Amino acid sequence: MLKCICRVYSQPLAQMVTSPLFKHMGSAGTYTILPITNLRHLSTKNCPLKIKSNRSEPLQFGDFERQVPCSRKSGSSKNVQKRLYELRQLKTVLSETFGVTEYASFFESLRNALHINNCSENEKKKLLYDIILHQHELYPEVARKIGFYLPGEVHRWFWYRIPKSESFNHYLFLLKSDVLLFTSNYCTRFTNRLIKGTEMERQLATFQIFLHDETNIKFIMEKVLKLHTFDSLIALVNGLVKAKNFRFIKVFIQALLQKLEQHCYSGKDGAKQKNLRYVKFNNTLLYYLLKSGNVELFIKTFQEELKFIVSSGLLNHIDGNEHILNFPIHHYLNLLRISNRQEELFNVISCLQSSPLMKYKLFKEFLMGELIASFQAFRDPKLVCKYLLSSYSSKASANILNALGIWGWLYHSKSTTLTAPTLARELKNKNNILPNTMRIGSPVTVPILTELYRSLLSSSSVSLESGQFKNCLLDLYYKYKSFLSEEAHKYRYWRNDTGILNVFLNYIRFQAREPRLAYNVLLDFYSQPFAKKVVLTTTLCPFSIVAYKNHTLTQAELSELLQVMHKNGVPLTFKFCSAMVMHYVKMRDEKGARSWYNKILFGGFEIRHMALIQIIKDQGWPFPKNFDETLLTELVENNNIKEPTDSTLFTDEDMFEEDGKPRFNDDDVNKCTNIIRETLKSLN
């Protein structure tokens, strides 16, 4: 019954029961406390609970709180404190029962607090925190076993009232108070905000901040299981895998498995739901095996999953659940691409182009992404553009390419913007090379454009003289900047991210060999009004590209970079901090280097970078407590450890090059391709 209360009832529970436990009387802290003799009578559906007195928890969440005040540290009005003290006196009685009425009372108190008119927002936040905190204290067993559900309007109020700088402490308060996460889109927004923030914020949102001490792992993972749904935990683990953050990945996969096993499947769709969840779990496992390079186990898991999907009858329920085939096939195509097996990739795509899966837009976008990314091996931007125009809306996409200056450099080898009639005439001569089933219809997306920029600049860096290539780079950059200012808002699905900017900076620094120009371009980009809306979507920060080994920059210019990062909310990354450590070591400024190393320690970054490890060892600095000491053995055994090259440390594996090339034999490829064919036959 408790699970139903916590996870199902989203409508005001006060309508379902008798009088609430507390009735608000109109001021910030005045409650009428109903007589104790009536409390048991009020509860229509009770759940007996046992109090576990003096339970010691291995973790003190207060250790992680920032200087920004939150919760009870801020204090509350004397009236509120007085009434809350009175509530504590009821703890012995109230802790024995918890049901619909108690939840309704809790909800009513929160909603009444939201509607107070004669107090400041800060006082209202304190009051909401106090209500949540004391609900947690009154029902410790409920908190320990199932957590607390908050009404959506409370999460909404928090989202719009709590400053971005206080998100860390707010989220920490929710965790301390055992508030169920992902029961509201607004709570999810807090999670996403933290994941896109600093390393500390990312570690809080993923609970990793508490896991560095092994004694905390059991307690924290129990909290993860309690506060997350299966789907939200899947999303969390996928995010860790995407970032190749494998420090605690086995613990999270075990938690996912527990979540999978503990769910109760009932009703006529129970078996189907159980099978669907198993496939979701398996897809996450496949993703991990792909990113970690475990090809042998990936192949086995992939084959077994497709066999299970067919044998379980899930293909009969593909509509609305197309992800069950989308993701495993996408992961397999990704493996073929990064293994440089283009021929096999094209063979699989030829099997797929007439399958029922092609009616799903997301699947077609997956397919085109892998197909176009695979063309990087050929250094042929015109080939990339042909497929782009054949798949996406050709007229809208051609207009975008023309405005960006790509069309001019690609087909005319110069900076030019065509008139509409000329562009239409040239577009008419471009033959469609894909079947209609593979057409997406919408304008080209930013990730595909990023691949086209990569291909064009890679080709131009070879075909053009250095001066011409520099002019090409700057012309494309200025037209891209103009497009973001004047045109991008016209396209509904346009997403301002750092992908294309990273491509420009990479080619300016490492191909054109213009490190100071890269610095000027970066500052120019972030001086534009649109820069505030640019999102970091990869693990690579553009500031890292500019700062790393850029010895042309003065101390004042590095300080300016930091100011621009702060102004635009760009978090410090491990790569940027490492770049600064190396900069100061080269300048023989031990104090400056240690200051930046302290930022790495404070941020909780994982250190596996051998050149940095060498610096730490040489300087006699302490290693972080979660440091893998086997890396020191590797350092001793390999006397040729050098500072990493430009293309290995400060380029993004997902954008510029992959870590190593997974290898698997032709027999494995044939088996996987054949099982895809058999699965598609069953789907037809």
UniProtKB/Swiss-Prot annotation:
Family under the similarity heading: Belongs to the ATP22 family.
Highest rank taxon of the organism: Eukaryota
Any one GO molecular-function label of the UniProt entry: translation regulator activity
Stated role: Translation factor specific for subunit 6 of the mitochondrial ATPase. Required for assembly of the CF(0) component of the ATPase.
Keyword Membrane attributed: yes
InterPro entries on file: Atp22 (IPR017207)
Places the protein is found: Mitochondrion inner membrane
Topology in the lipid bilayer: Peripheral membrane protein
Main location: mitochondrion
CC annotations in GO: mitochondrial inner membrane
Protein name per Swiss-Prot or TrEMBL: Mitochondrial translation factor ATP22
Keyword annotations from UniProtKB, A to Z: Membrane, Mitochondrion, Mitochondrion inner membrane, Transit peptide, Translation regulation
Transit peptide: 1-56
